[in-house]
């Protein structure tokens, strides 16, 4: 549990992500991926998917995650929409796959 999240929390988040066929992969980054998180650290996830992975989908996922009443803030982004080169390099360097859509 390098990222400091209980497995039950991870499974709840993965269950939400799995309900959205637009999400092909979720990558955990930030302090939780680096292992230098604090108890209340947020959960930074960037998502990979096709052209149908839009901000509207992100908002729906965030609404579903909010209903879980998790004791953590969850920040979602779409990897292909990130323009900050430093953030992209950080994700490439420390990011870990958190969820992957099952192959048919």
Task: State where each predicted segment sits.
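Catalytic core of pol beta-like nucleotidyltransferases
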Residues: 1-25, 34-39, 50-104
């Amino acid at each position: 549990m390098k990222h400091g999240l209980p497995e039950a929390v991870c499974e709840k988040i993965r269950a939400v992500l799995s309900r959205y066929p637009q999400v092909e992969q979720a990558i955990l980054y930030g302090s939780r991926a680096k292992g230098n998180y604090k108890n209340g650290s947020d959960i930074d996830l960037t998502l990979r998917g096709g052209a149908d992975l839009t901000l509207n989908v992100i908002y729906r996922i965030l609404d579903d995650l909010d209903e879980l009443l998790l004791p953590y803030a969850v920040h979602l982004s779409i990897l292909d929409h990130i323009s900050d080169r430093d953030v992209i390099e950080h994700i490439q360097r420390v990011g870990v796959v958190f969820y992957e859509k099952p192959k048919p």
